[in-house]
Amino acid sequence: MDVSVEIPSCALGEDPENMYATLQEAGWLVVTGLATPAELDAVKSELDPYLAAAEVEADDSEAFYPGHTRRVIALMHRSPTLRQLMTHPTVEQLGDRHLLQNCKKWQLNVSAALQIGPGARDQILHREEDLYDYWAPPRPNLILASMWAISQFTAANGGTQIVPGSHRWAADRVAQPHEIVRAEMPPGAVLFWLGGTLHGGGANLTRDEWRYGVILTYTLGWLRTEENQHLSIPFAEALALPEKTRTRLGFHTDYNGQGLGFYDPSVLLPD
């Protein structure tokens, strides 16, 4: 790790143009203070039963996902608090600036709670936009990713690996060890990174700390999402959600108002 690299960071309330300029340049940004202690406690309370039931994954050195990790997906049904944080004003500001360049509406791509335990190895470096391999890197703006720190993130306990500037690299450039930075941040902070930025979960070198984070990524409204939100949340529950939340969950289509059968899914929602 190149310890000389300063983590680009700011606090809640920073001018959104300044935030996005930093994010565009560095490929990543930490914003502190986005979730309150009460919201963090609520997320823990809502997800604890699911994480307690999740099997701690065994490790396979060649597998994409490291072992010694608990993973829970489909969070929008399981955590009402995360549904609110999913449309946090800072998320909306950065999402609009990054994604509306290539769409009219953008949507949640995937949600997952991750607890990285002692003994976990570094994850393979990858790009969120590798999901859409029709384009070769560097790609157009396709994804904005975020990692919410539910616990403290440190270089030792599994802080996310980031390769600054890699969103501008060609596909065949390989990150060297000195180019990798580990994101450190307090609970309630959010790490944002661009879909083209190389990153991966960090190794947990501690004896007894579990690094707890929630990943929410967003993509263009006309792309197929990695996680099908229409199947992840009961329809009756979706009916009662605010319009902006329904839009982020893909209930309002992006392209010419046309969805499956030329109907926007919103025709099923209340006026």
Where are these predicted regions, by residue range?
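A structural signal for well-ordered alpha-helical segments within the folded catalytic domains
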Residues: 89-93, 144, 186
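Conserved double-stranded beta-helix
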Residues: 169-192, 196-198, 202-271
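Short Ser/Thr-interspersed hydrophobic loop/turn segments at strand-loop and sheet-helix junctions
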Residues: 114, 152-153, 196-197
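Residues that flank catalytic or metal-binding motifs in active/ligand-binding sites
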Residues: 68, 78, 109-110, 142-144, ...
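Catalytic core of non-heme Fe(II) oxygenases with the double-stranded beta-helix
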Residues: 120-185, 223-233
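A conserved hydrophobic position in a structured secondary element of the catalytic/binding core
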Residues: 77, 86-87, 163, 193, ...
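A structural signal for short, well-ordered beta-strand segments
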Residues: 110-113, 146-148, 214-218
